[in-house]
């Protein structure tokens, strides 16, 4: 997921996507603790995607204020 894909979406779409990615991160962490996660690097990727989504949301809010 790239930032350029996210900046064209609406705030509502971004918030829904953020909620889904947080749930995905939770599931990955549960799998990690249960020793069922084959690639622990997926947690890092999920965290980075969440950060990208939050950045896009903040950019939308700051552009609407100006």
Swiss-Prot record:
Disulfide bonds: none annotated. InterPro entries: Ribosomal_protein_uL29 (IPR050063), Ribosomal_uL29 (IPR001854), Ribosomal_uL29_CS (IPR018254), Ribosomal_uL29_sf (IPR036049). CDD domains: Ribosomal_L29_HIP. Keywords: Ribonucleoprotein, Ribosomal protein. It comes from the Bacteria. SUPFAM superfamilies: Ribosomal protein L29 (L29p). GO terms for cellular component: cytosolic large ribosomal subunit. It holds the Pfam family Ribosomal_L29. One of its GO terms (molecular function) is structural constituent of ribosome. One of its GO terms (biological process) is translation. Belongs to the universal ribosomal protein uL29 family. This is Large ribosomal subunit protein uL29. The gene is rpmC.
């Amino acid at each position: 997921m790239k930032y350029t894909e996210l900046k064209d979406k609406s705030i509502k779409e971004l918030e829904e996507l953020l909620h889904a990615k947080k749930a995905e991160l939770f599931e990955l962490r549960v799998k990690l603790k249960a020793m069922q996660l084959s690639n622990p690097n997926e947690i890092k990727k999920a965290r980075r995607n969440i950060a990208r989504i939050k950045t896009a949301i903040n950019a939308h809010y700051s552009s609407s204020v100006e």
